[in-house]
């Protein structure tokens, strides 16, 4: 009896030891080992069994704080209390109730009642620092160092002289009386009279010389260039009217050249001088005025 009891006890001890080893293995695999490193990172080590093989996985994690700078007005709006279905929601748009659209570039147009001479002077003043030209300002009425629109003698000297200047700026051959009653004429509508480029006897298709003077042709352009890339590079020299990147009809890939049209000739000239020979995406761009099609 004692011998049988002794064998029984040994069998129970063996089973108990085997179960303890399995529990230890399960505890080792289920509990990840987390170590805090001296450089601020954290290492997590885990183990797993797959097809009788033991695998060890080590992951290093580094926490970084990213500071985002926003305008003061945006920060103030984020503190507003939400209402309705969004009452109590955290700051920022909720994807469940708010749809975020694409960014739209909003360009303010010219005022219809603003004289052309004031428009050109304001745009020239805005473009001068970008172009880097050191030219003085001279009044067309009293020859003083100020803009014509700011002339203190405008009421006295701005009669027939201003009317004649308006007629010359429009580039027409009409009498002075017609120039007095006319308002601002956009560049694409100028010289539309008889003999002008857009009228009878002018250039075919209503195309004027101003189109070529305002449009730049960009060649040796990267195939990865987009309209946004050109607007970003050429937009700092003046207001852009349109950008066209030529693409292949079959593949849709850019063909290596594009056209950029400005609203003022001075802006186009400044962009030509600055961007001709400029590097973009490992290529040297060639910039020149667009040529007419025969």
From Swiss-Prot:
Bias kind Basic and acidic residues: ranges: 1-22
Composition bias, Polar residues: 30-42
InterPro entries to which the protein is assigned, alphabetical: eIF3_g (IPR017334), eIF3g_N (IPR024675), eIF3G_RRM (IPR034240), Nucleotide-bd_a/b_plait_sf (IPR012677), RBD_domain_sf (IPR035979), RRM_dom (IPR000504)
RRM domain residues: 214-292
GO BP annotations, alphabetical order: formation of cytoplasmic translation initiation complex; translation reinitiation; translational termination
Main location: cytoplasm
Feature: compositional bias, Gly residues: 193-205
Highest taxon of source: Eukaryota
Pfam families tied to this protein: eIF3g, RRM_1
Keyword annotations of the record: Cytoplasm, Initiation factor, Protein biosynthesis, RNA-binding
PROSITE patterns, A to Z: RRM
Disordered: annotated segments: 1-42, 164-211
Entry GO CC: eukaryotic 43S preinitiation complex; eukaryotic 48S preinitiation complex; eukaryotic translation initiation factor 3 complex, eIF3e; eukaryotic translation initiation factor 3 complex, eIF3m; multi-eIF complex
Subunit structure: Component of the eukaryotic translation initiation factor 3 (eIF-3) complex.
PANTHER family per record: EUKARYOTIC TRANSLATION INITIATION FACTOR 3 SUBUNIT G
Role of this protein: RNA-binding component of the eukaryotic translation initiation factor 3 (eIF-3) complex, which is involved in protein synthesis of a specialized repertoire of mRNAs and, together with other initiation factors, stimulates binding of mRNA and methionyl-tRNAi to the 40S ribosome. The eIF-3 complex specifically targets and initiates translation of a subset of mRNAs involved in cell proliferation. This subunit can bind 18S rRNA.
Family: Belongs to the eIF-3 subunit G family.
Protein name: Eukaryotic translation initiation factor 3 subunit G
Organism phylogeny: Eukaryota, Fungi, Dikarya, Ascomycota, Saccharomycotina
